[in-house]
Regions:
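Charge-dense, helix-prone N-terminal extensions
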Residues: 1-138
Length: 138
């Protein structure tokens, strides 16, 4: 099970990230002042992690055990998932989705901001959705 230390270390390893504790103790990770991941203890037992996803990933993940549309964010039509209980995702899969969230948010920044942060030009990285499609075809 992922800990705050694991979560913060992984998010901090992604390019051009910043960390702030806000919203009643949530660990909020941003790229270019835009949130890509939020970590917060649920009932002081389980680290809940909220991350942005594509429409395809949202449809795949929203009804999986231990996952749900993120409260507040998803209700406004934004595609965010919260990993809140077991079984949820493995730590490895959770890291992939956090990295994908970072990629999605980074791509939404202006080119000017991407350049300022050293994120532009992006290398062609296959999205999680593309990887899922290749697995289904193969």
């Amino acid at each position: 099970m992922m800990t705050y230390e694991d979560f913060n270390m992984f998010c901090g390893s992604l390019p051009a990230t910043t960390h702030v504790v806000q919203w009643r103790g949530s660990h909020v990770w941003k790229v270019g002042d835009k949130v890509f991941a939020i970590g917060r203890w649920n009932n002081r037992k389980y680290l809940g992690v909220t991350f942005k996803v594509s429409e395809i990933s949202y449809e795949v993940l929203k009804d999986e055990p231990g996952l749900r549309p993120a409260p507040y964010l998803a209700s406004r039509g934004i595609k965010w998932i919260q990993h809140y209980a077991e079984p949820g995702l493995s730590d490895g899969d959770l890291k992939l989705y956090i990295a994908e969230s970072h990629r999605i948010v980074s791509l939404g920044l202006t080119k000017k901001k991407q350049k300022e942060l050293g994120l532009y030009p992006f290398q062609k990285i296959e999205s999680i959705d593309d990887q899922i499609q290749h697995c289904k075809q193969g």
